[in-house]
């Protein structure tokens, strides 16, 4: 099996989709779609609101290690600066190990975003 997408229930899907497309390199799979696809075209997120009476999860109060969306970054520090300027909040920045640079941020709605630069990929070649 191959992973297709991860679904995230948020209070304001349209705003999160717009921010993700503008700042994280996503694009909608089709106009008006809840699916946004990364620049590889191989992985996507479904950003939606369930429409139920219960509130969307409060991602800002969750530990970022419980759920986060991770991205490969060629320059973690530069991407942190760019995302913070776009409204993200920095929680953790670790760039002292040359084999692994990492940052945890939260988008403007509290959803955790991880940036990673690894010496060796976690994927099979």
Question: Where do the protein language model's features map onto the residues?
Answer:
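N-terminal beta-strand motif that seeds the catalytic metal site of vicinal oxygen chelate
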Residues: 1-17, 66-73, 119-125
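Vicinal oxygen chelate
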Residues: 80-125
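Short amphipathic alpha-helices within nucleic acid-binding modules
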Residues: 19, 77-82
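Short secondary-structure junctions
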Residues: 25-31, 89-94
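Amphipathic alpha-helical segments
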Residues: 12-28
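Short hydrophobic/aromatic beta-strand element in the GNAT-like acyltransferase core
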Residues: 44, 70, 102-104
């Amino acid at each position: 099996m191959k992973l297709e997408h991860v679904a995230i229930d948020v209070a304001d899907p349209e705003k999160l989709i717009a921010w993700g497309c503008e700042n994280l390199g996503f694009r909608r799979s089709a106009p008006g779609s809840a699916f946004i696809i990364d620049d590889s075209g191989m992985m996507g997120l479904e950003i939606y609101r369930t429409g139920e009476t219960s509130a969307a999860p409060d991602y800002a109060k969750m530990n970022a290690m419980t759920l986060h969306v991770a991205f490969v970054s060629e320059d973690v520090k530069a991407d942190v600066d760019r995302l913070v300027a776009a409204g993200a909040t920095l929680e953790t920045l670790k760039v002292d190990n040359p084999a692994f640079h990492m940052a945890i941020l939260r988008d403007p709605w509290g959803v955790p975003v991880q940036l990673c630069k690894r010496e060796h990929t976690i994927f099979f070649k």
